[in-house]
Amino acid sequence: PYLPWSEAHAWWMHGSIRSDDAYKGGSGVSDQSAWHDMEVFSSVTANVGNNDGPWFKGYVAISRYNLALYALSKVTDENYPLKGVRTGEVKFLRGATYFFMKTLWRYIPWVDEENGRTVEDVTNISNRPNGTDDTYLWEHIVADLEEAVRLLPEKQEEIGRINKNAARAMAAKALLFMAYKQDARHQVVEVDKKILERALVYINEITDQEGGNVGLCEDFAENFLPEYDNATKEAIWEIQYSINDGTSSGGNTNNGAELNAPSWEPYFPCCDFHKMSFNMANAFRTGTDGLPLFDTFNDAEMKGRFKEYFDENSFDPRLSHTAAIPGYPYKYNPDLLY
């Protein structure tokens, strides 16, 4: 469905601006002030649209997955030969959606096709049953994704459908998060190596296909240019959107992504959000050997001399994809200077 910016599930607004990677941007502090509050971690209000929207739309999606799984449980493989594959697809979607929500809010109510059949059932579900920690949530998420790995085929004929590699990748990612145990202040206090080993199994199953089903593009830009949609080996799974499809909103799009561009007429009339931090820009610095400066990348300060700064230092070329820098090529066209 169409996702307006206030309801979008997008890492830039819920991840980058909450970290040291980016600033909110926009026309000022009052422009989407809820995101500013998240950036400075002050006066965060849970029921403001920009905060409540992703929660609401997340559970709208969860409700649909649960209805689909309940309906699938009522048919037989004989009557519906695709039952297993479709169940795997929905399990993946539910696991991936819960993963996103779990990383944002940590303690969330787990609602599934068994415990959330009625409004009353859902109302009575706690986000911390019996005061438990969040391990049980990770276990549910991983269980969904591992079931998807079991049920899904290696290849799907229809574009956009989830395959086994997508489930492997998502299961590995969830296990990696689960392995790093955190205390109440989100500090890592333990690393569970057995869980890391479980993640490594799925990772190896993907990387063992390098040169065949998966691999790196010869040109980094191919991951982002529209002519390569659904056609690169780097893409594990691509969400499908549509425009000019007859809907009242003009398309089924993730509107939050539309704010993620510099305000630059005539190319982008809006909206100048998601401004890269100096720390993030510095992270692209390299030594004379072209390798990252892991320990010293943030030692230099621009102090208003950005032109000299970029001339005097060397950077990973992917910086041009990530940031719009005045006087330098924008994205992948060397003749288009920002």
Segments the model singles out, each with a brief description of its role:
Residues 79, 114-117, 122-126, 132-133, ...:
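General structural signal for secondary-structure boundaries
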Residues 107-135, 181-198:
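Short coil/linker segments at helix-helix boundaries
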Residues 38-41, 119-122, 256, 281, ...:
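Intrinsically disordered, low-complexity regions
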Residues 1-6, 27-105, 126-139, 143-159, ...:
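Conserved, well-structured interaction surfaces
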Residues 1-33, 108, 146-147, 161-168, ...:
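An aromatic- and glycine-enriched ligand-binding surface/loop that stacks and positions planar moieties
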